[in-house]
Design a protein with these regions (language model features):
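Conserved ABC ATPase "signature" region
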Residues: 99, 103, 110-128
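Catalytic Walker B motif of ABC-type/P-loop ATPase nucleotide-binding domains
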Residues: 157-161
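Helix-to-loop junction immediately C-terminal to a conserved catalytic motif
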Residues: 51
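Conserved ABC transporter NBD signature motif
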Residues: 59-70, 74-75
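ABC transporter nucleotide-binding domain
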Residues: 175-265
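Conserved ABC ATPase signature
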Residues: 91, 132-136
Length: 307
């Protein structure tokens, strides 16, 4: 089966900074794939190259088996793009924005009104038909941006941080909308800083570091790459003593912001962990199953920009 999106060996440099360093990824038709990684790892650059807003220094992007470089402007009509920064015209009403982009993307004139009406209803925008787009809340602007990105029924939907600037309630609403798109078979590539978002929406997650994919798979597959079956979180008066004792026991140790997490090589109960760390001035211990966050920290090693 031909991949909906095939990316091979992308390189991109800005001045002295090598942003992409052999980035490769495949997205299957009907799949939702999330890109996770720290700030500056190249996520948005990848999306901009896919959408032909940037040109790679080397490498190839294929859409449904056809090289993007050979399709020129036509390729853009096969992709729906929802950028981080709103591309809406603030003085237009929602239906006018949809109408404008329908014309821009080449939707036949005879179909435009029906497309606008369908998207206004699908994204519950009808109550805001008399509100200028720039006056909508962040969540409703993002809904409208999703509608605009789908106006030409693209083969691939690209979402750059789709819920980055909205409140929790709006984020839940947007997740529900994206889940509906996923369940209807829409092929989606998205970037996110929210691990819960990736876990909820994505069939697969690709973890990025230094401009390339360092691990990819379903959430269970990524978790299986963590060398431990449980995570012990420790509060201690003497972190160094805990770390030293854990190393002696052969446990993997991770420390961030003054907190210690231990990846156990086998399942232990709290009493056994406490006994093993006896004398290390431990105040509190908790044991949790390995999560996507643990996989991210183990495989990428940076949690400064995730939540």
């Amino acid at each position: 089966m031909t991949a909906a999106l095939q990316i091979d060996g992308l390189f991109k440099r800005f001045g002295e900074q090598q942003v992409l360093n052999g980035f490769s990824l495949q997205v299957t038709r009907g799949e939702v794939v999330g890109l996770l990684g720290p700030n500056g790892c190249g996520k948005s650059t990848v999306l901009n190259i896919i959408c032909q807003l940037l040109q790679a220094d080397a490498g190839q992007v294929q859409l449904a088996g056809q090289p993007m470089i050979e399709q020129s402007a036509h390729a853009r009509t096969r992709i729906g793009y929802c950028p981080q920064q709103s591309a809406l015209y603030p003085d237009l009403f929602p239906q006018e924005n949809i109408q404008f982009f329908a014309r821009l993307y080449g939707v036949p004139a005879a179909q435009r009104n029906a497309v606008v009406a369908e998207l206004m209803e699908r994204f519950s925008l009808a109550p805001y038909a008399a509100t200028r787009s720039g006056l909508l809340s962040g969540g409703w602007q993002q809904r409208l941006s999703l509608a605009v990105a789908l106006v030409h029924r693209p083969e691939l939907l690209v979402l750059d941080e789709p819920t980055v600037a909205v409140d929790v309630e709006a984020r839940m609403d947007l997740w529900h909308l994206i889940e509906g798109l996923r369940d209807s078979g829409t092929t989606i590539l998205l970037t996110s800083h929210h691990l819960a978002e990736a876990q909820r929406l994505c069939n697969r997650v690709a973890l990025m570091r230094n401009g390339k994919v360092v691990a990819e798979g379903s959430v269970p597959e990524l978790i299986s790459q963590v060398p431990g079956q449980a995570v012990v979180k420790v509060q201690s008066e003497d972190n160094q003593a805990v770390i030293q004792r854990a190393i002696e026991l052969g446990w993997s140790v991770r420390q961030h912001a003054g907190k210690i997490s231990l990846l156990l090589p086998h399942n232990l109960n709290l009493r056994e962990v406490g006994d093993a760390l006896d004398g290390s001035k431990v105040n509190a211990i908790s044991i949790d199953p390995v999560t996507l966050e643990d996989a991210y920290l183990e495989l990428v090693g940076d949690n400064s920009s995730i939540s």
